[in-house]
Amino acid sequence: MTATRNVKGLLGTKLGMTQVWDENNKLIPVTVVQADSNVITQLRNADVDGYVAVQIGYGQIDPRKVTKPLAGHFEKAGVTPRRHVVELRTADAAEYELGQELSVEVFEAGQKIDVVGTTKGKGFAGVMKRHGFHGVGASHGAHKNHRKPGSIGGASTPSRVFKGMKMAGRMGAVRHTTLNLTVHAVDVEKSLLLIKGAVPGARGQVVLVRTAVKGA
């Protein structure tokens, strides 16, 4: 499948959240993402690969910890080994060059973006925390049922639990995309993106910031 739109993207590290004042003297909560040392490690084309994309590497890693096939891959691109690699399907892939460095200048203030990351892991959680169940009354005969899920299905009919039943289980630590966030400011000197609102993941989490796929 050939990409039909131009997509810009960077990998970065979530540094945390803070708040800044805007031009209307309103306090805006922002997430700070540091996106330095992004480099093009491979170019995909329709003739060889069947699709058009750019591969971006991010984050330094000890060369001794890189497998020989990956070491050869990075050497071919003329770059030092990178810890994280991601592909972006974009129609303008031919305009990039192997080894080209990318900076936060690919984004501008006011631009709509999507942020992809891994959410915080919560461990094994009950239905009230995991799915927002209201639980049972705190008194009046609710004996040790306060946080229980209730019925999960019939007995002889259907004599099974339907797939997708909301039950207790491991919560978080899943890949999540937050759509249509806004870039509040770009600090080129420090390679920082200030993004309005929250993005998935804990401090220190690697996230992908890309052009929004929906909306403006």
From Swiss-Prot:
UniProt keyword annotations, A-Z: Ribonucleoprotein, Ribosomal protein, RNA-binding, rRNA-binding
UniProt keyword annotation of RNA-binding present: yes
Domain of life: Bacteria
Coiled coil: none
GO terms under cellular component: cytosolic large ribosomal subunit
Family annotation (Pfam families): Ribosomal_L3 (PF00297)
InterPro entries assigned: Ribosomal_uL3, Ribosomal_uL3_bac/org-type, Ribosomal_uL3_CS, Transl_B-barrel_sf
GO biological process, one term: translation
Positions of the UniProt region annotated as Disordered: 137-158
UniProt-recorded Gene Ontology molecular function terms: rRNA binding; structural constituent of ribosome
Self-association state and partner proteins as the record states: Part of the 50S ribosomal subunit. Forms a cluster with proteins L14 and L19.
Protein role: One of the primary rRNA binding proteins, it binds directly near the 3'-end of the 23S rRNA, where it nucleates assembly of the 50S subunit.
Similarity comment: family membership: Belongs to the universal ribosomal protein uL3 family.
NCBIfam families: L3_bact (TIGR03625)
Name of the protein this chain belongs to: Large ribosomal subunit protein uL3
The organism of origin for this protein: Arthrobacter sp. (strain FB24)
Taxonomic placement: Bacteria, Bacillati, Actinomycetota, Actinomycetes, Micrococcales
